[in-house]
């Protein structure tokens, strides 16, 4: 099925709407009009973009303007096929690896090529450029329009596993599990899977050496993958939203606003919790092998001095 996207003036948008009014159907989120004919689906988004999909998409779209140039971003290594940004892709990303408090979260999300424009309309982009309130809003919208699978490794399990394996291996196991879960739910396999690279490909699969069901078909790895395909950006936003929800719950449990990251503010809060609840409870809420533990212990000792 062909897809053409035009950026049209308000006047041209109204022309499209007028031409397709008798074929009108209920529009998707962030769209003000949609129509379906035998050969083409037309969607007019609030942003002014108009998407034509179907066998007659190009023939119909050319009546109204020239298509927006499609993004074909690839890493410098050239390891991804041409036009990859417009494929139907499962993206996978993780959140929480560098945070002392809170779990490790991995999300695998599928964006069909027919939904790429819709996902962009929802505001999906590199999550580092999105505020926490917006993350929550976009994640709610994504929940309604794309399939995804998530895995949460809570701190008690994280600390237990960390005694015998690296964080990298834990992360790889979570990615593989989320990918397996999502793939079993899809009606047809994606054109590709893109993992935001946290380890070299050989190292990633070495981490999975003991796993029976290793996802290997059409799997690509790239750093800064959020900027390469919107599926990874969507996965990252969903993972962050889940992580934020977990942190909210942790704040309620402790009666303290729990900060993200692993900086000096984290040390101060950890020291306070250590004094109030003791080391066993602190271990339930943190990645205990981080250097923050020793720093919090030192701060707690200073505060306890007469």
Curated annotation (Swiss-Prot):
The keyword Transmembrane helix does not apply. Keywords: Cytoplasm, Endonuclease, Hydrolase, Magnesium, Metal-binding, Nuclease. One of its GO terms (cellular component) is ribonuclease H2 complex. It comes from the Bacteria. InterPro entries: RNase_HII/HIII, RNase_HII/HIII_dom, RNase_HIII, RNase_HIII_N, RNaseH-like_sf, RNaseH_sf, TBP_dom_sf. Gene3D superfamilies: Ribonuclease H-like superfamily/Ribonuclease H, TATA-Binding Protein. It is found in: Cytoplasm. Manganese or magnesium. Binds 1 divalent metal ion per monomer in the absence of substrate. May bind a second metal ion after substrate binding. CDD domains: RNase_HII_bacteria_HIII_like (cd06590), RNAse_HIII_N (cd14796). It holds the Pfam family RNase_HII. One of its GO terms (molecular function) is RNA-DNA hybrid ribonuclease activity. Endonuclease that specifically degrades the RNA of RNA-DNA hybrids. This is Ribonuclease HIII. The lineage of its organism: Bacteria, Bacillati, Bacillota, Bacilli, Bacillales.
């Amino acid at each position: 099925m062909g897809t053409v996207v035009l950026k049209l003036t308000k006047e041209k948008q109204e022309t499209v709407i007028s031409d397709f009014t008798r074929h009108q159907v209920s529009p998707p989120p962030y769209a003000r009009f949609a129509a379906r004919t035998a050969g083409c689906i037309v969607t007019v988004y609030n942003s002014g973009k108009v998407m034509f999909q179907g066998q007659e998409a190009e023939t119909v779209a050319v009546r109204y303007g020239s298509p927006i140039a499609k993004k074909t971003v690839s890493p410098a290594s050239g390891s991804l096929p041409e036009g990859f940004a417009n494929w139907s892709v499962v993206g996978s990303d993780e959140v929480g690896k560098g945070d002392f408090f809170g779990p490790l979260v991995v999300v695998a999300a599928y964006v069909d090529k027919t939904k790429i424009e819709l996902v962009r309309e929802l505001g999906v982009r590199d999550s580092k450029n999105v505020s926490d309130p917006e993350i929550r809003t976009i994640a709610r919208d994504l929940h309604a329009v794309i399939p995804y699978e998530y895995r949460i490794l809570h701190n008690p399990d994280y600390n237990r596993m960390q005694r015998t394996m690296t964080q990298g291996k834990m992360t790889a196991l979570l990615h593989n599990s989320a990918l397996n879960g999502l793939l079993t739910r899809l009606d047809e396999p994606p054109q590709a899977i893109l993992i935001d690279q946290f380890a070299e490909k050989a190292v990633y699969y070495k981490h999975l050496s003991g796993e029976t069901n290793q996802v290997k078909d059409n799997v690509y790895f790239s750093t800064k993958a959020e900027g390469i395909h919107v599926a990874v950006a969507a996965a990252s936003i969903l993972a962050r939203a889940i992580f934020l929800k977990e942190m909210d719950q942790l704040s309620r449990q402790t009666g303290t606003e729990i900060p993200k990251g692993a900086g000096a503010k984290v040390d101060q809060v950890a020291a306070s919790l250590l004094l109030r609840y003791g080391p066993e409870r602190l271990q339930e809420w943190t990645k205990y092998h981080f250097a923050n533990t020793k720093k919090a212990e030192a701060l707690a000792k200073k505060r306890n001095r007469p």
